């Protein structure tokens, strides 16, 4: 094993995702409520609003949506209303149905590359950790998905009372793991919530760009977790210096 000791992961859209997909579930629920919404419609609305999610999240008026159930409901219901507005739909019953569906453990599955990647890293001697902005029921979902036991450290914002990008959540993870920042990697799908705050904490970040949204990102980028072992090895060979040239994993 290299100078890297532990690899932390984000959860949503990194390890797990709505199953079969967010647009498919969204369209299915809308259709069940009598609305003519196709998967293509839902996909297009998601694509259009995705770059503005940080701003939309601020518009909800909920500062920490994962801490309390009522705040979670307010936060996500606001976002679902915004998505529906793009489709010309106003239906509070549908908003409630969407919130119920996407708050149900059975609506989620692991990406196909997750277990091979986690087991491969374990076999190489790396410890595994989790740092996620999620309600406390993520803990139960990790057990249901049979990966909870793989993480030596699990930092879930709804349990700990601190959310990304607050640097304290990264320091908490390092403290729990007994790890040094320069010996840690964090993998996530968001530049703002994963890459930038992890780097600010001294952790080596890896951006997981499954949909090819961040081709010009100036850092370590992978398109799937099958590329992660190579990226971690490359990062381990770099000096701990912010001036180090960026790495792009092969195949990304």
Feature names for model-found ranges:
Residues 1-7, 40, 89-95, 115, ...:
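Asp-based, Mg2+/Mn2+-dependent phosphohydrolase catalytic module
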Residues 2-115, 124:
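N-terminal helical cap/lid subdomain that shapes the substrate entry/recognition surface
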């Amino acid at each position: 094993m290299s100078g890297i000791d532990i690899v932390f992961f984000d959860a949503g859209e990194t390890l797990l995702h709505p199953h079969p997909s967010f647009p498919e579930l969204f369209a299915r629920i809308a259709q069940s409520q009598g609305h003519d919404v196709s998967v293509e419609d839902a996909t297009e609305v998601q694509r259009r609003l995705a770059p503005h999610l940080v701003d939309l999240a601020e518009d909800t008026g909920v500062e920490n949506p994962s801490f309390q159930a009522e705040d979670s409901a307010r936060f996500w219901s606001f976002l679902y209303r915004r998505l529906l507005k793009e489709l010309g739909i106003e239906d509070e019953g549908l908003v409630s149905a969407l919130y119920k569906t996407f708050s149900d453990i059975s609506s989620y599955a692991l990406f196909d590359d997750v277990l091979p990647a986690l087991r491969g890293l374990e076999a190489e001697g790396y410890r595994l950790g989790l740092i996620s902005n999620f309600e406390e029921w993520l803990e139960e979902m990790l057990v249901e998905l049979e990966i909870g036991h793989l993480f030596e450290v699990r930092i879930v914002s709804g349990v700990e009372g601190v959310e990304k990008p607050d640097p304290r959540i990264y320091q908490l993870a390092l403290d729990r793991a007994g790890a040094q920042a320069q010996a840690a990697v964090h993998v996530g799908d968001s530049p703002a919530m994963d890459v930038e705050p992890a780097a600010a904490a001294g952790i080596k970040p890896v951006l997981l760009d499954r949909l090819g949204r961040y081709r010009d990102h100036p850092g370590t980028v992978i398109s799937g977790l099958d590329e992660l072992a190579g990226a971690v090895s490359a990062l381990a060979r770099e000096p701990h210096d912010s001036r180090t040239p960026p790495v792009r994993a092969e195949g990304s």
